[in-house]
């Protein structure tokens, strides 16, 4: 449904005042109106009239995040908005941020129509992204997860696992996870691998020697893409409510199984977001 156009202030767009004047004074000559139009023309090179494209794009995603706080939406719909925010943020870094970084690397920095240089835009975006991520996790942990728990939907952390659930997760790891994961040791002969875009990975600090007698202080464990990130606990294990466990929690719990004879000193999960702002070359 079409809505009535919003009125803009005189200092933002003087041309509208001319239109209004012509409507109330139809006998005004075209020559006089054209002269007034030229004297009131906007300087299109003035950066005040432009919004930075990347910042505007990110502001849109902030509006998506705000919908996750809107109590007028159903609970699962609010959770869905939180997921959309994450998906949009991935795409934003793949396309927009990668484009800005490419400009920095080229050394040919030029300000945009808004007057901001790529380095300035990146600094602003990084500050705003940190604040948005803090807000995202606050909404998840303080609002959505407690509300879901009241509806008997639980996302179980490792410290919440019962003995029965612990035994089930160990069986799931042995049968489903262990056979499809190949850890990657990092040493001078094995540099950092090219990981799949947006895949879940773990980087580990190790102590001791592997089965071949080699010392490897670092290793990467890529999570299998064939398995779901969220695993539903069977009813015969937990009959009440709907209970879920993250695949990352299971891997983290049993990650030492990949390195017999070695001690895992640290285990941290990470993702790599790659540049997807590709340029098409002309084929002659």
What are these regions (language model features)?
Residues 5, 10-284:
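N-terminal non-catalytic structural scaffold regions of very large proteins
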């Amino acid at each position: 449904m079409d809505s009535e156009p919003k009125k803009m202030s005189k200092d933002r767009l003087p041309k509208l005042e001319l239109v209004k004047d012509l409507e109330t004074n139809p006998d005004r000559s075209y020559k006089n109106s054209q002269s007034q139009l030229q004297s009131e023309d906007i300087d299109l090179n003035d950066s005040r009239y432009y919004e930075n494209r990347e910042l505007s794009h990110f502001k849109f995603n902030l509006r998506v995040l705000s919908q996750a706080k809107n109590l007028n939406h159903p609970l699962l719909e609010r959770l869905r908005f939180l997921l959309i925010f994450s998906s949009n943020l991935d795409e934003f870094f793949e396309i927009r941020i990668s484009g800005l970084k490419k400009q920095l690397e080229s050394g040919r920095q030029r300000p945009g129509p808004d007057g901001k240089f790529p380095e300035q835009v990146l600094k602003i975006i990084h500050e705003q992204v940190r604040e948005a991520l803090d807000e995202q996790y606050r909404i998840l942990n303080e609002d959505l997860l407690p509300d879901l728990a009241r509806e008997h939907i639980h996302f179980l952390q490792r410290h919440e696992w019962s003995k029965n659930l612990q035994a089930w997760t160990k069986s799931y790891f042995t049968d489903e996870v262990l056979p499809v994961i190949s850890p990657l040791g990092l040493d001078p002969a094995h540099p950092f691998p090219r990981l799949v875009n947006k895949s879940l990975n773990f980087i580990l600090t190790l102590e001791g020697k592997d089965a071949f007698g080699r010392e490897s202080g670092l290793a990467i464990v890529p999570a299998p893409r064939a398995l779901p990130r969220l695993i539903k606990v069977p009813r015969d294990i937990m009959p009440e409510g709907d209970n879920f466990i993250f695949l990352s929690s299971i891997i983290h719990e049993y990650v030492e199984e990949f390195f017999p004879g070695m001690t895992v000193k640290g285990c941290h999960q990470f993702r790599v977001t790659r540049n997807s702002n590709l340029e098409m070359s002309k084929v002659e």
